[in-house]
Amino acid sequence: MALSHDVVARASALIEAPSVTPATGAVFDVMEAMLAPLGFAVHRFIVGVPPEGPVENLFALRQGPPGSRHFAFAGHLDVVPPGEGWSSGPFAADLRQAPGGALLYGRGAVDMKGSIAAMVCAVEAIPAEAGTISFIITGDEEGPAKYGTVPLIDYIRAVNAVPDFCLVGEPTSVHRLGDMVKIGRRGSVNMWLTAKGAQGHVAYPHLADNPIPRLVALLAELDAIVLDEGSAWFQTSNLEVTDLEVGNRATNVIPAEARARLSIRYNDHHTGQVLVDRVTAIAAKHRTEVRATLHGEAFITLPGVQSALVSAAVEAETGIAPELSTTGGTSDARFLRALCPVIEFGLTNATMHKTDEAVAVEDLTVLTQIYRRIALSALS
């Protein structure tokens, strides 16, 4: 498979390979065809079963001189479903001229096939003797993330290829390329609450047990909790009720069960299990059961060598001194942080997951130069 070395052509080739999560196949063929000619040994493997799988993962390694440092780029090739209402095909990689410069449209242009294309082009300009470089690429970041980066980490450890530093290409920039770098993320835990009672006729409440008042009282108590006031690098933790369901369509029936769902995004004052235990203890007073799923603990790569070299590279190419932040949702950095220090930096996120997702061609070009500077600095 012959591919142009131009960053737009590479981003287009990735976009044109549809890869709605969980991703396998063609898009990884494109990725391998980009990396193999650059001297990378590419290992691909598929794990998982429906509905969360199968998922394809890729680890590519270009070995540097003995004893050299090891820098890794990480990202995902899976994308969210395109939805309706696109002005051109979501996988057409439509390049359009606009008053502010050319834009490349397509699902994944921002999140994050554009960034991955920039990574590849950046590495192409780095000689092998500069050091060891790897790519940690999954097809399961936008989904449950069960069969993606976690088994990749297991493989990397098994082959003794742990990097010294990893950069994740998530779209961290807000208003313009370079204005924000992520050095950590809050933790995330979801909980399902079930209050059980006894069904009955509304005219005979003494023969029933209505679970709704108990669940409402529980939610009110939880909503009133102030978890913390934030910390040095994190915003305030927040608990949000995200669903309330009874499913009772009859006007004269007291339901037997009421359910709710909540999500907590929390900072480094907490762990997920402590929060689950706290909610469970409160729920017990209201005779309500709790089931929880932890999606990742809060983490931070404290400002230091890694953040300094990323910031310096960004400022050298954009003139912007980026803000170091821990805001936003979760990413696979929550897994990679167990492997090595990790920082996230990438394109502007205004159109990610939206209809007509698009990236400025100029941003792709500048991002390539930023990634090249970061890699060279990390290897030096």
Set out the residue ranges of the language-model regions.
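Short beta-strand segments
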Residues: 74-76, 136-138, 167-170, 194-196, ...
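Acidic/histidine-rich catalytic neighborhood of metal-dependent amide-processing enzymes
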Residues: 103, 112-184
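N-terminal helical capping/dimerization or prosegment-like subdomains
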Residues: 1-83, 257-263, 270, 274-281, ...
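Short secondary-structure junctions
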Residues: 37-47, 95, 287-291, 319-324
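Metal-dependent amide/peptide-bond hydrolase catalytic core
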Residues: 1-2, 81, 172-176, 183, ...
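Active-site metal-coordination/substrate-binding segment of hydrolases
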Residues: 68-134, 363-366
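A structural signal for isolated positions on well-ordered beta-strands in alpha/beta enzyme cores
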Residues: 43, 72, 134-136, 289
